[in-house]
């Protein structure tokens, strides 16, 4: 996220290094910082300086306010356009000497564009095409189990209709927790892929566990590398960031 002017006191108070993307940000941080990174817009048209004139103006202000430019950066928006973006980026930063460069998120790193620093996202969590160990998993537990007969229904408006004898598990987690954005087609219960049924509630959801010896309290794997791979989720940002504050976070240090 780019620097927000209302946060100038926080940036200065904690000696943070802001990424500056416009001249107004430099003005608002006058006297509060001694170092910054400069964001260059190389084609995404989101944040950043995109002309030599703008960059020259920024450098003049930084020098006037005695602020060191630590690094310049951009953001690759498409692996197919990296070379085109690099060409524009290199032309814009040509006058700048002795500063670090960081441009690459996971896609750029996998393409070999490393520069001085990198900004990996999903790769740090074990997602992507490299053979790396996943470091994030979302799990829940079975709250209840029901054996339904042919003709039985379940869920709001009876959306789940049983054409065959069906064993369902009610699993903790719902809209309130962001589960609706996390769930794919399957979850894993006792190392078996189980179909998620089409009814998510505020605090729980339904899973078909027919033929599996499942007990109340059983762990349910809701999101993981293997589930993302099975559902063919290539860029699982939405799932990785969707879970809200009520869910318990457990950190393992190795």
Each language-model region and where it sits:
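C-terminal accessory subdomain/extension
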Residues: 147-254
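Electropositive phosphate-/nucleotide-binding environments in soluble metabolic enzymes
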Residues: 20-23, 52, 83-86, 132, ...
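Active-site loop/helix belt of alpha/beta enzymes
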Residues: 27, 32-35, 40-150, 211
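Gly/Ser/Thr-rich beta-alpha loop segments that engage phosphate groups in nucleotides
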Residues: 4, 45, 50, 123, ...
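Short, hydrophobic beta-strand segments that form beta-sheet elements in well-ordered domains
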Residues: 1-2, 16-21, 100-104, 118-120, ...
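N-terminal active-site wall of soluble small-molecule enzyme domains
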Residues: 1-30, 80, 109
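A residue-level structural signature of the nucleotidyltransferase/glycosyltransferase Rossmann-like core
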Residues: 17-18, 101, 115-117, 135, ...
């Amino acid at each position: 996220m780019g620097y927000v002017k209302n946060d100038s006191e926080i940036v200065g108070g904690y000696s943070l290094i802001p990424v500056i993307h416009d001249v107004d940000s430099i003005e608002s941080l006058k006297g509060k910082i001694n170092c910054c990174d400069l964001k260059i817009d190389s084609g995404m048209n989101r944040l950043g300086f995109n002309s030599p004139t703008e960059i020259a103006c920024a450098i003049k202000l930084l020098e006037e306010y005695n602020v060191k430019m630590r690094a310049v950066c951009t953001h690759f928006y498409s692996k197919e356009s990296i070379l085109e973006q690099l060409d524009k980026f290199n032309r814009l930063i040509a006058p700048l000497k002795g500063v670090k460069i960081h441009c690459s998120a996971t896609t750029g790193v996998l393409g070999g564009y490393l520069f001085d620093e990198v900004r990996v996202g999903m790769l740090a969590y074990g997602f992507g095409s490299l053979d790396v160990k996943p470091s994030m998993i979302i799990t829940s537990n079975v709250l209840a189990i029901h054996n339904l007969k042919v003709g039985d229904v379940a869920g709001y408006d009876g959306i789940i209709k049983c054409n065959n004898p069906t064993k369902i598990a009610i699993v903790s987690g719902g809209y309130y927790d962001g589960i609706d954005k996390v769930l794919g087609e399957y979850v894993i219960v006792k190392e078996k892929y189980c179909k998620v049924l089409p009814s998510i509630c505020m605090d729980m959801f339904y899973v078909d566990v027919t033929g599996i010896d499942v007990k109340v309290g059983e762990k349910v794997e809701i999101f993981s590398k293997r589930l993302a791979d099975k559902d063919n989720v290539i860029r699982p940002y939405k799932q990785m960031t969707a879970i809200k504050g009520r869910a318990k976070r457990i950190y393992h240090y190795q």
